[in-house]
Amino acid sequence: MSSLFPFIFLFLFSFLTSFRASAQDPRFLAYYCPNATTYSSNSTYLTNLKTLLSSLSSRNASYSTGFQNATVGQALDRVTGLFLCRGDVSPEVCRNCVTFAVNNTFSRCPNQREAVFYYEECILRYSHKNILSTAITNEGEFILRNPNHISPIQNQINQFTNLVLSNMNQIAIEAADNPRKFSTIKTELTALQTFYGLVQCTPDLSRQNCMNCLTSSINRMPFSRIGARQFWPSCNSRYELYDFYNETAIGTPPPPLPPLASPSLSDKSGNSNVVVVAVVVPIIVAVLIFIAGYCFFAKRAKKTYGTTPALDEDDKTTIESLQLDYRAIQAATNDFSENNKIGRGGFGDVYKGTFSNGTEVAVKRLSKTSEQGDTEFKNEVVVVANLRHKNLVRILGFSIEREERILVYEYVENKSLDNFLFDPAKKGQLYWTQRYHIIGGIARGILYLHQDSRLTIIHRDLKASNILLDADMNPKIADFGMARIFGMDQTQQNTSRIVGTYGYMSPEYAMRGQFSMKSDVYSFGVLVLEIISGRKNNSFIETDDAQDLVTHAWRLWRNGTALDLVDPFIADSCRKSEVVRCTHIGLLCVQEDPVKRPAMSTISVMLTSNTMALPAPQQPGFFVRSRPGTNRLDSDQSTTNKSVTVSIDDKSMSDLDPR
């Protein structure tokens, strides 16, 4: 009888929660804030913007059609906005997405006169410009790639490219001719594989403008992947080899939204129908859930795991779905051959692997003598499994086999940032524009962890070797073995076990075990200074009594010679105003008082807005004073038995960064 308890619990829990599934928050993808112009607090523009957003998210908005636009105000204070819901979603899902997007507008793009917010189910957009009936294809682009490549054989690549173009161009024509400016396609490739495509324009566009926008969108998609999507503010396109849209909703008129008021009790026949539905539907759902639960536990009992990683970027990942067969990983890495080794990460070696289906992966094999225990291992899996952001490396699976613990990640072509930044033979490949792009990408990734993901995550080990670079030199934050999850209202946590890397750790964490979002901000500041200078913080050669990079940068700033910090490889080609501003931001991040360090949301605005005034930086943490006998704080060393001389404010800190 006791063996039935898991099923009974699953049944009751699923029954009680199944009716709340539709109320989950929409999946946020990206936002675009050009920061060309801003508005001030209490301005007429802000008042008009609030009125506009209220109108777009009102109960009377056009959720059934999935599109609405509005304009509020006059002349320079005029603001125009719109929402566009994906053509296959229900009015209720549309309303939920738009309302959620409106409620998060000011936290994502504060004080911006123009913005676009991309969600899985909808797009929200506003601007001080006239954005209606105009196809925008030169700004606000966002691309998502399925991490799985198609076969490397050239003729298969050409065949697949032709297939994608043929199908996508066909539905682009259909969408342009459709009043809803929306179309999908389903094409069987083989008995086991089907192609799915979707395109959509905002319905205010003319046929020609919609066609031009979709043509641009489709041509910018990476056809080397088995799935991809591209967004412009005015249109978007997507293809996959799985069913990602609601086929039953295509071609049928959307049902009306459910009434917000209580129904009348006078219609007896109507009430009887409601009672029947209310009784029958939960029973059917409960039976299906029970069957699914039985299959789930039966599968667990067999202890059989996948032989290749699942790459469906839209499925919510579970620990069970991530567990891979050890022998498959062993074969993918040629039995962890030295020829496959591509580096060393936290707690173990990293190998390149290729699965039988052609998927390239990075395999981290944890050392058997590693300090990372089962807690950290499971923590890394749980933390990373459901994160979805282009500036975070994605976990594809894991394996536990006796003493072996293995993590499988997406393969990132250019390895880590430190391989370029600190190698005299390679650092010349990092032009200033690339370094500036990398700084911005890291900032967006940290902002997602701190604010935009479902959980508040503190990384605790941000450093150059944990920033990976893909084929286009886009940064991806990696190695979440030391990350911690915060509660919704939690701003700080203490620990007696200090983990991380010296030189990147904030003073309050290194000395008192206190960590918060501002600890990651400190690490980000050190990274920014390293990217600008091309020098490691811990290997700094003493100059003018400076014993680390942070101290050196602070003294140059204080002396008015900040440009002397710049890496000689980029000194003649960099934009000096951007370099100085980034140095300024880096020094704000490494200030000794954590309260005075800016939040990542503020940093993102600082990096993209040249009009935002920056406060003067104050003394950094671990600032080395010119006196004999000062111990040096080194990087990449154990934190035990290491004394340092620092100056730290002992008052408690609070983090005001909003979620």
Swiss-Prot record:
Phosphothreonine, modified sites: 501
Localization, UniProt: Membrane
Domain Gnk2-homologous: 27-131, 142-244
SMART domains for the chain: S_TKc (SM00220)
Single GO cellular component term: membrane
Annotated membrane topology: Single-pass membrane protein
Residue ranges annotated for the Protein kinase domain, each copy included: 336-622
GO molecular function, one term: protein serine/threonine kinase activity
Gene: CRK7
Any one GO BP annotation for this protein: response to reactive oxygen species
Lineage per the UniProt record: Eukaryota, Viridiplantae, Streptophyta, Embryophyta, Tracheophyta
The protein's name in its UniProt record: Cysteine-rich receptor-like protein kinase 7
Native organism: Arabidopsis thaliana (Mouse-ear cress)
